[in-house]
């Protein structure tokens, strides 16, 4: 660990911040000093139940994992003689929890990438164009409303829900926070109107009422650790039993993970493109609101979403590809199962001669593994797949630029950017406009920690075209190789 352990807050006590990132693969907590230096981290695997029906998670298990890693890093804070001043929670969008009046979960969490959803009903009753222009979300199985309607139809009791909490908002409750709906996460639900950032009436009528809580911006206070009642069903994780170093910390929702990460790496500004390549690859632009409704309709029709940003007064234009997941599956088919193996495969792919072969196929806008081409080496297969995925990303960027203008610079982030073949392909396509910000370890958690400092009144909210204070000076240590 490097750097000082924190900085003195208003009371003269050494203070630090926690960023919690509830990801598709891992639940991660980062302890960060007020200067941006990483002090420690903890993680647990995100436990999904996968079967022939799809991918789901137990809401209470997810909450317990989030509390566990937060408690673990707060124990480190105590050993360092540091008090936790703020906790910011970010994570996956779309997935969430339907609850009753006492926040008891009524259905499992359906994974954001699970194909189950009742989007046919939305199209039948509201119309595709109306939904996409009204919410900024493409009409498919991904928006939360599609999964909510499917659960209401198939899961007994789900139709009694009075609230829907996105996963980060759910874990905030477990820490003793207040019920809130953060704007960037609410924008992923299909329940929020894009024009006015209020519950969208057609969606509310379709699901039986507004399922959103009080709407807030990422970085606004949403209670204090240990102050609220927590969640029924988690007696071993009562907020009142939180460690003294954590009790009373200001809580906030850090927003949708891709957007929170873009803030941490300095890409949440006009004219910048974030290409964040993790399990999903996110191509993200931050643009001043409002966006012309006709442009919203055209973008959504191409699978590009538009929603409210973690930056005040801005929209996020986002296109997602399951690129990292595709490479993970391909690596397993090639007999490569660890990070070193993937790195070596990437190095070999950089040296391989281009074959022009296509080893992936696209169906309905999604990329799938195609039949591996006989006669190619593993390195040639890897190189061909990486090039195909980079081409898909390039086409999506072209669609976005046609509506919001050409980007001036590019920030590359995410674990897969540390694979030599992926980074080489991106640098080839972006040229000199690309900067790799791999120095930020766990950018989503770092961004959430920063926003908790904003909520606690210890750090300034970044200016609209500025960089977070941490991005201008100290950086956390480097992430491990993907």
Regions found by a protein language model. Name each.
Residues 1-108, 133, 160-161, 209, ...:
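N-terminal glycine/serine-rich phosphate-binding loop of ATP-dependent small-molecule kinases
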